[in-house]
């Protein structure tokens, strides 16, 4: 598929609002984590072939960090995505002010696959 078409499809999907659902994000992150774990051996082989990284080094510098970050994100995303009350300015009195955390948009990551 053409990269321009992929970007177009991703922007359409983002504008649908589905990515604002925290449960949707958790599901996708869990799927990503599972796929990484399922393909660990293949990824280790590529890291050894291309960068001469041992399995231990691959785990320490690649898998361990990535899986830990995914676990942390899955665990905390509900808390991070809640609105946060902030102090109101005198100019806005009387008001209630909040910060809403929302996704910015779509990202396209291109990579060569050597599996």
Q: Which residues are covered by each model-predicted region?
A:
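Conserved small/polar residues in nucleotide/adenosyl-binding loops
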Residues: 113-115
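N-terminal Rossmann-like NAD(P)+-binding subdomain of aldehyde/semialdehyde dehydrogenases
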Residues: 1-104
């Amino acid at each position: 598929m053409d990269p321009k078409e992929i970007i177009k499809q991703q922007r359409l999907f983002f504008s649908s609002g589905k990515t604002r659902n925290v449960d949707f994000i958790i599901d996708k992150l869990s799927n990503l984590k599972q796929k990484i774990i399922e393909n660990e051996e293949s990824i280790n082989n590529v890291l050894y072939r291309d960068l001469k990284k041992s399995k231990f080094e691959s785990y320490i510098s690649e898998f361990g960090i990535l899986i830990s970050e995914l676990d942390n994100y899955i665990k905390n995303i509900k808390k991070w995505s809640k609105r946060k009350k902030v102090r109101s300015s005198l100019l806005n009195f009387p008001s209630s002010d909040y910060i809403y955390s929302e996704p910015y948009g779509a990202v396209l990551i291109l990579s060569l696959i050597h599996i």
